[in-house]
Regions:
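Glycine-rich phosphate/pyrophosphate-binding loop
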Residues: 112-115
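Short, structured secondary-structure elements
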Residues: 1-109, 119-123, 131-172
Length: 172
């Protein structure tokens, strides 16, 4: 038993004994140029903790959301020991990805820091109560499990309008 914010921090920026979430992604390996393990880590963190689906944006600008290919790669690059080259539909673009968190208002990742420090920064940004996105995502998932439908639907598209913003804010 531990507070949720500590649990999330340990999953995203793991100590040796809690590396399963991030390291567990590596068993699949690199699927194709757009689905490197770093991109898979970014997709998982975005979906689980932020309620965002980056799968389309990992290959091309998303058709189902406003997320862009460069944003998905910049987020994936936080998880990478080397600078990722952006691939559009498995074809190299010749552009190198930056390193940025998906929501700039949460803070700025030190692009020059080593991977472990970037993951610590990311974890710290995600759990801060200032933005509350992590907690809204959690509340929405629990509500959906208990009530059969989320306050925001689908639960992996937290950019959609909630049917009750006041309730979501209060619960989070």
């Amino acid at each position: 038993n531990k507070p949720y914010n500590i649990f999330v921090k340990e999953l995203i920026s793991p100590a040796k004994e809690s590396q399963g979430f991030i390291q567990g992604i590596k068993w699949r390996g690199t699927i194709n140029a757009s689905q490197r393990t770093e991109m898979q880590a970014a997709q998982n963190v975005a979906q689980v903790f932020l309620g965002l689906n980056l799968k389309c944006a990992s290959c091309h600008d998303s058709f189902i959301s406003d997320w862009k290919l460069e944003e998905a790669y910049a987020f994936a690059n936080i998880f990478s020991d080397t600078t990722l080259e952006i691939n559009r539909c498995d074809k190299p673009t010749g552009k190198m990805a930056g390193r940025k968190i998906l929501f700039q208002e949460l803070g700025e990742i030190n692009a020059e820091a080593v991977t472990s420090e970037r993951l610590k920064q990311l974890a710290d940004f995600l759990v801060q109560p200032k933005d509350g996105r992590l907690y809204r995502t959690l509340v929405n998932r629990i509500w959906a499990q208990l009530m059969g439908r989320g306050i925001i639907e689908p639960v992996d598209v937290m950019d959609n309008e909630p049917w009750s913003q006041d309730l979501l804010d209060w619960l989070a």
